């Protein structure tokens, strides 16, 4: 698959997926400008130089915790569940595929031994503060 795909259900955006074969001719961010987590593809022609810089320290208020991971090796399934705990979608990711988990209940199932680059907002407050385990319908 190519391109960027959004996983939505009942008005909730669960995830954005960027498939490994996706290419752009210039830098492009896919997340809405107001999103607390920005992701995109950087693309420049040979010889491009970004001037030396640093990022301004600005206080930001973030109420949601989003996570992105990019599969380096292996195969991973991400399952999405509705507000009643019912599975409504499964996405299978291969090396080079990336996903941003935005809202809603999800589970990760490793199909083949995997390694992923994972990025999420900090600071880390401990699993007991960052995660809520949910009972789901397995029927």
Annotate each language-model stretch with its function.
Residues 23, 41-63:
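Conserved short histidine dyad/triad with adjacent acidic residue
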Residues 45, 71, 94, 101-102, ...:
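A short, compositionally biased micro-patch
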Residues 45-46, 64-79:
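Glycine- and acidic-residue-biased ligand/ion/polar-headgroup-sensing regions
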Residues 109-139:
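Double-stranded beta-helix
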């Amino acid at each position: 698959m190519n391109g960027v795909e959004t996983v939505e259900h009942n008005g909730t955006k669960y995830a954005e997926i960027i498939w490994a074969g996706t290419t752009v001719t210039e830098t492009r961010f896919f997340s809405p400008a107001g999103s607390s987590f920005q992701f995109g593809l950087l693309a420049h022609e040979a010889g491009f130089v970004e001037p030396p810089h640093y990022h301004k320290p600005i206080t930001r208020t973030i109420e949601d915790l989003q996570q992105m991971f990019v599969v380096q090796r292996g195969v991973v399934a991400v399952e999405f569940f509705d507000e009643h705990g019912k599975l409504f979608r499964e996405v299978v990711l291969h090396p080079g595929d990336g996903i941003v988990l935005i809202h809603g209940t999800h589970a990760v199932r490793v199909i083949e031994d995997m390694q992923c680059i994972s990025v999420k907002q900090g600071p880390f407050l401990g699993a007991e503060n960052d995660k809520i385990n949910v009972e789901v319908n397995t029927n």
